Amino acid sequence: MKEFGLIVVDKPIGPTSHQVVAIVRKGTGVRKVGHAGTLDPRASGVLVLCLGPATRLSEYLSGTTKEYEAIVRFGISTRTFDTDGEITRRSGRAPARREIEDVLPEFRGDVEQRPPPYSAVKVQGRKAYELARAGDDPTLQPRTVHISRLELRSYQPPDLALRVECSAGTYIRSLAHDLGERLQTGAHLAGLRRTRAGPFPLDQATAWPMLEVGMLTGKWERYVLPAAAALPELPAVVVDDKGLEALRFGHAIPAEPASSGIAKAIDSTGELLAVLEAVEDGSLWHPRKVFFG
């Protein structure tokens, strides 16, 4: 059974990311399953699942650039910044297309963004949504995020379709809310689809019904990608049997030629063995994470 690798799934609207993880854990029999970047229940699209030792790769995947297609609905603001929340403002007005085009540049590049009150951001040790549900009004500090692309795809008032490419930690719900505030109409996020997570575009994702059938029939392993696919930008160091034994016991291996930064160690078949870090002036590769026993 393949207990080391990735499944890139097209998450449907409805389940939480944690529910998807639980279903896959039960359906595959793999005891350790995690995800590399939460998608809200009402969002669909690319969700990267990590199996077995590959859960230790989530730190490299969760911080990658994400791409989304979003629907912003003007005229109504909500407490959750999406369609689920209590309405807090109803202006009944949608801005003109030219007004939107004029303000979009303000939301590109480095942007100060305050997370939604209903989010998993910690406030004094508790998640913001827990405080909000208890009737508190959590004070969330703004954070700097980077929006590298923000394109107007179409506009049929009151609904604006956007394409967004952004850094990890960007809340598209906050982007929708902030657009409404800037245009003085109010707005909320009416739809969201993640079209890329790091190196994985939507067209590489397995449709959820296909994965469900695969789990029912015992053929889910066909959808497992090699763990090395999570690290396409890292240089590869092919390790021989001697190096394999050294890494197994946490020992460094020679770097030939001298190197810097981090790399991935693979065997002759391309299987990921470890994440390496250059030490001793680049003459050695020290194993930062080892994925075999």
Label for each model-derived stretch:
Residues 1-168, 172-205:
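Catalytic cores of RNA-modifying enzymes
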Residues 1-12, 18-35, 39, 43, ...:
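Accessory RNA 3′-end/elbow-binding domains used by RNA modification enzymes
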